[in-house]
Amino acid sequence: MKMIKSVLVIGSIFAATTAFGADQAAVRVEPTNLQGPRPLEKQTEAAVIRDYLQAWHSFGTALDQNRADLLDTDFVGTAKDKLADTIQEQAKIGLHTRYQDRAHDLRIVFYSPEGLSIQLVDNVEYDIQVLDHDKVLTTQKAHARYIAVLTPSEVRWRVRVFQAESE
């Protein structure tokens, strides 16, 4: 009986957290045509894309729950600092924001000769909901061009620069 209750509680929590846009984002990756001394291996490209998309998930969860600690795995440097500041500011006024990415159009534009950074451009479509506690204040569709620079850490690529340019 305890097992059934646990499953029901976990299922309810999962359903509640995925109610706003449960669909997975469509991802399109443009072929990489980098000119330079260091070729981008397919395994590295796949890892960068996987980790960048995971960072989007962490970003959305952190802003929804107002928990900057959720950024630790996927963000470093100025990207992490700016997002943490945003979380602190919205929490201070009692708001939280839900991001649901709908589509990513990714293009890797730079891979450093030392292999210490990769820059990508992401034309992303997403939905934004701003909530005051659990009351929805606004829901908007957005399209932006993100510039991201990722650097390798011990086991994954982490986002160091995460800058949006609205369209």
Map each language-model feature to its residues:
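Short, low-complexity N-terminal intrinsically disordered segments enriched in polar/charged residues
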Residues: G21-G77
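Contiguous, function-dense segments enriched for cysteine-driven chemistry
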Residues: A25, T32-L40, V48, Q88-E89, ...
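Short solvent-exposed loop/turn micro-motifs enriched in small/polar/acidic residues
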Residues: Q54, D101, K141-H143
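Exposed beta-sheet edge and beta->alpha loop/turn motif
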Residues: A19, P113-E167
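Polar/charged side chains located within well-ordered beta-strands of beta-rich proteins
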Residues: W56, D101-A103, D122, D127
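Short solvent-exposed beta->alpha transition segments
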Residues: P39-K42, A68-P113
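Amphipathic, hydrophobic N-terminal targeting peptides for secretion and organelle import
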Residues: M1-L34, A164-S166
